[in-house]
Amino acid sequence: MARSVWKGPFVDGYLLNKADAARASGRNEIIKIWSRRSTILPQFVGLTFGVYNGHKFLPVQVTENMVGHKFGEFSPTRTFPGHAADKKAKRG
């Protein structure tokens, strides 16, 4: 179920402070965040965030198409090793 409109998008407070500081400094450095649940806002466009996936920080360059989505959508937590090879085909 989607979040109700009257509540507005959820964003952790520290994330807004970090984004404002990055904009003020003018340097294009990666902003490390753990908040995968936060919504991407229009003011984050152009910034690069390092979104933690439980193992490492994956760099996410925010574009206009990402606005309204969550940071966690762009940092997968599971790796798919592929299906097992067919042992009968290898043997003969």
Curated annotation (Swiss-Prot):
InterPro entries in the record: Ribosomal_uS19, Ribosomal_uS19_bac-type, Ribosomal_uS19_CS, Ribosomal_uS19_SF
Keyword Ubl conjugation tagged: no
Superkingdom assignment: Bacteria
GO biological process, one term: ribosomal small subunit assembly
PROSITE patterns: RIBOSOMAL_S19
GO-annotated molecular function: rRNA binding; structural constituent of ribosome
The keyword rRNA-binding appears for this protein: yes
Keywords annotated in UniProt: Ribonucleoprotein, Ribosomal protein, RNA-binding, rRNA-binding
Pfam families: Ribosomal_S19
Protein family according to the UniProt entry: Belongs to the universal ribosomal protein uS19 family.
Function summary: Protein S19 forms a complex with S13 that binds strongly to the 16S ribosomal RNA.
Family annotation (NCBIfam families): rpsS_bact
Protein's UniProt name: Small ribosomal subunit protein uS19
Native source species: Granulibacter bethesdensis (strain ATCC BAA-1260 / CGDNIH1)
Lineage of the species this protein comes from: Bacteria, Pseudomonadati, Pseudomonadota, Alphaproteobacteria, Acetobacterales
